[in-house]
Amino acid sequence: YTLLCHTTSTSPISTVTCPSGENLCYTKMWCDAFCSSRGKVIELGCVATCPQPKPYEEVTCCSTDKCNPHPKQRPG
């Protein structure tokens, strides 16, 4: 079984089948220079272990198919 996660490595955002061994989807958010006008930068993808957030990052991980939708998009 391989997990399906949303990913921001493609444009527009798409769903990818995670490689073997990467059994978590993650969402990582942080502010860059354009945060006040564009909002937080959002990165989505697959990981083997949930990354440790840096002090300025928010990281969430989950383990079900497509469980990491873009926060501004409705799951679909």
UniProtKB/Swiss-Prot annotation:
Keyword Oxidoreductase: no
Domain of life: Eukaryota
Keywords: Acetylcholine receptor inhibiting toxin, Disulfide bond, Ion channel impairing toxin, Neurotoxin, Postsynaptic neurotoxin, Secreted, Signal, Toxin
Pfam families xrefs: Toxin_cobra-type (PF21947)
GO CC annotations on file: extracellular region
Signal peptide: 1-2
Free-text tissue specificity from the UniProt record: Expressed by the venom gland.
Compartments (UniProt record): Secreted
CDD domains registered for this protein in UniProt: TFP_snake_toxin
MF GO annotations: acetylcholine receptor inhibitor activity; ion channel regulator activity; toxin activity
Predominant location: secreted
Ribonucleoprotein among keywords: no
Intrachain S-S bonds: C5-C25, C18-C46, C31-C35, C50-C61, C62-C67
Function: Binds with high affinity to muscular (alpha-1/CHRNA1) and neuronal (alpha-7/CHRNA7) nicotinic acetylcholine receptor (nAChR) and inhibits acetylcholine from binding to the receptor, thereby impairing neuromuscular and neuronal transmission.
Self-association and partners: Monomer in solution, homodimer in crystal state.
Family in the record: Belongs to the three-finger toxin family. Long-chain subfamily. Type II alpha-neurotoxin sub-subfamily.
Name assigned to this protein: Alpha-delta-bungarotoxin-4
Organism: Bungarus caeruleus (Indian krait)
